[in-house]
Amino acid sequence: MNKFLTAAPVVAAIWFTATAGILIEWNRFFPDLLFHPM
């Protein structure tokens, strides 16, 4: 459990960075699809 507590912030930071990067790249290539109404 102690190893999980030390690894959790690192995994969360990498996950949020990857998600933000994917959203930025998607918005750069497809700017109209991100804000298109469903």
Swiss-Prot record:
One of its GO terms (biological process) is photosynthesis. Keywords: Membrane, Photosynthesis, Photosystem I, Thylakoid, Transmembrane, Transmembrane helix. Coiled coil: none annotated. It is a single-pass membrane protein. The chain crosses the membrane at residues 4-24. It comes from the Bacteria. It is found in: Cellular thylakoid membrane. Signal peptide: none annotated. GO terms for cellular component: photosystem I; plasma membrane-derived thylakoid membrane. Pfam families: PSI_PsaJ (PF01701). Belongs to the PsaJ family. This is Photosystem I reaction center subunit IX. It comes from Synechococcus sp. (strain CC9605).
